[in-house]
């Protein structure tokens, strides 16, 4: 086997195409048994530039991080006694032989180690993939033989270079080596012993240094080169990337291993915006959302209205607005009083505050609207629009009470208090009749029906909400009695009422705040009224009621 002959003046081989890194070539020659001299010229026409370390884990053997771009080695064979003569006769395509190229990996710089420590220089870096390539005869870019390495991966990061070793299997005896030196390398045993073939080492060529990056520092794969495309178009298996896949990251690149020589000029350095501060701000806002919802919870809206009851009953309620929404009959039971000095919180100014003994009928009407026509519930729910002042409203509405105070009789003669006042919504009296201008629409009937479940008049009878003469409105007095929850036959003097502050700070049951069912009856003068549910339908007689002067009279019964 002929020893490799490098380009030198002794062999009349000039320095050929050594200007560029892709044109560096290694040339050798040998003499065959037939007396011919063959010249081998091999060069790396596509140098590797970068790679990503594929690691050394259990699955690293299946991890493919190919060197980019894939190395391409060109081989040409010439025949001639001298190099000048050989360049005129290229026999690459006509020479009958098999060639393969074996790639090995080595460090670009020699690593120094401390004394006494095991030298790891003898441990070669791990190269995975397909390090062997057969020669492909291609017409482009030039007619020559090409070795492609599209599947070479490196496990560890660092700076490396590839060494390509050329082996030849001769097919004809005349092309074998003329004489073999004893000190020369023996031929490799062929893969097919039956044929007696063998592989002879011809030459080697080294690539330029390239960098293997870690996964964190890898700049990404570049677009496939024109040479890779040309080779792939001719049937070779080379991966083609038509889009740039370079990473946009800010960090160190080739400066880690190039010793300050050159940088990878295609790497793009673009700082990625840091969004960690935005995440912290978003979490802070989400955490503060619970505190923002606290002032709008249900408890702060209900508690101030309940706490207003004790201060409202510190003085007598105003006479003009206590029960005017019930028809004005009960509005004359209390003498006029100065406005309340308390200040109601702003969370409940929209809904007027009612005393516990009298607010039940009004709240019952708003919670359970009765079937009468729309005008009655509308005026009932908005007493300020129907011409009647609300019961104990906020201080800003107290002027309304005094404005409507002259609309009906104000003073009542003081009467003896009833013997018993249970702490229930029945603490009221039978309201005396009032002049027509202060009687409310017939929403009182709807309230009594919703509380006592009595049949109500037809909508045509209740449609007229204008004030009526006293004779026509007299039968409504018993209905007022049912809604006002009287505890005695006569009006109750305000001085004798127990302080209703006991209901201000606690929740009450529905039966304590609203009308009890008809089967339970009502207390009047210490006895339970049994005949209230039949007043309208079953009782054919006249309807007695008590006037303001204390006398009883029979009213005209409504027929429907």
Curated annotation (Swiss-Prot):
Keyword Transferase: no
Record's compositionally biased regions (Polar residues): 444-453
Location relative to the cell: Nucleus; Cytoplasm
Motif extent (Nuclear localization signal): 49-54
This protein's record includes keyword Zinc: no
Regions of compositional bias (Pro residues) in chain numbering: 336-355, 411-439
Record field: compositional bias (Basic and acidic residues): 171-183, 395-405, 508-535, 546-560
Compositionally biased region (Low complexity): 461-479
Region annotated Disordered, chain positions: 49-70, 171-197, 250-560
Origin superkingdom: Eukaryota
A GO CC term attached to the entry: nucleus
Assembly: Component of the heterotrimeric velvet complex composed of laeA, veA and velB; VeA acting as a bridging protein between laeA and velB.
Sequence similarity: Belongs to the velvet family. VeA subfamily.
Protein name: Developmental and secondary metabolism regulator veA
Taxonomic source organism: Chaetomium globosum (strain ATCC 6205 / CBS 148.51 / DSM 1962 / NBRC 6347 / NRRL 1970) (Soil fungus)
Gene name of this polypeptide: veA
């Amino acid at each position: 086997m002929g020893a490799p002959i490098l380009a030198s003046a002794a062999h009349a081989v000039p320095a050929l195409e050594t200007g560029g890194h892709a044109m560096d070539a290694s040339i050798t020659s040998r003499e065959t048994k037939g007396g011919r001299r063959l010249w081998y010229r091999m060069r790396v026409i596509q140098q590797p530039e970068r790679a990503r370390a594929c690691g050394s884990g259990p699955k690293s053997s299946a991890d493919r991080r190919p060197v980019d771009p894939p190395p391409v080695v060109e081989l040409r064979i010439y025949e001639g006694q001298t190099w000048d003569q050989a360049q005129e006769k290229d026999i690459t395509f006509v020479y009958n032989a098999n060639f393969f190229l074996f790639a090995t990996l080595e460090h670009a710089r020699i690593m120094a180690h401390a004394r006494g420590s095991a030298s790891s220089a003898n441990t070669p870096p791990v190269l995975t993939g397909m390090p062997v390539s057969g020669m492909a005869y291609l017409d482009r870019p030039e007619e020559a033989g090409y070795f492609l390495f599209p599947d070479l991966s490196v496990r560890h990061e660092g700076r490396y270079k590839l060494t390509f070793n050329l082996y030849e299997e001769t097919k004809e005896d005349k092309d074998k080596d003329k004489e073999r030196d004893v000190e020369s390398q023996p031929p490799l045993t062929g893969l097919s012993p039956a044929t007696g073939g063998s592989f002879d080492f011809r030459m080697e060529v080294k690539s330029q240094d390239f960098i293997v990056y870690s996964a964190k520092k890898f700049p990404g794969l570049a677009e496939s080169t024109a040479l890779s495309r040309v080779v792939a178009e001719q049937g070779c298996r080379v991966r083609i990337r038509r889009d740039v896949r370079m990473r946009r990251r800010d960090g160190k690149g080739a400066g880690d291993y190039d010793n300050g020589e050159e940088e990878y000029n295609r790497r793009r350095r673009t700082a990625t915006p840091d969004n960690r501060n935005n995440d912290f701000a978003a979490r802070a806002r989400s955490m503060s959302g619970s505190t923002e919802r606290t002032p709008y919870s249900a408890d702060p809206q209900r508690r101030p209205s309940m706490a207003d009851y004790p201060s409202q009953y510190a003085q007598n309620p105003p006479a003009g607005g206590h029960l005017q929404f019930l028809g004005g009959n009960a509005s004359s039971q209390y003498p006029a009083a100065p406005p309340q000095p308390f200040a109601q919180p702003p969370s409940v100014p929209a809904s007027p505050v009612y005393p516990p003994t009298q607010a039940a009928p009004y709240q019952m009407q708003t919670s359970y609207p009765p079937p009468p026509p729309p005008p009655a519930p509308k005026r009932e729910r908005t007493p300020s629009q129907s011409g009647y002042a609300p019961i104990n409203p906020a201080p800003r509405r107290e002027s309304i009470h005094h404005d409507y105070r002259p609309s009906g009789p104000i003073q009542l003669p003081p009467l003896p208090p009833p013997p018993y006042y249970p702490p229930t919504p029945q603490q009221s009296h039978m309201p005396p009749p009032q002049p027509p201008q202060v009687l409310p629409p017939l929403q009182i009937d709807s309230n009594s029906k919703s509380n006592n479940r009595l049949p109500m008049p037809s909508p045509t009878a209740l449609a007229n909400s204008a004030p009526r003469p006293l004779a026509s409105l007299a039968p409504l007095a018993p209905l007022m009695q049912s809604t006002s929850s009287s505890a005695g036959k006569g009006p109750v003097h305000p001085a004798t009422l127990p302080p209703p502050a006991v209901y201000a700070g606690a929740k009450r049951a529905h039966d304590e705040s609203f009308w009890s069912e008809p089967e339970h009856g009502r207390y009047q003068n210490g006895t339970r009224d049994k005949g209230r549910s039949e007043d309208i339908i079953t009782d054919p007689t006249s309807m007695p009621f008590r006037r303001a002067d204390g006398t009883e009279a029979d009213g005209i019964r409504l027929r429907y």
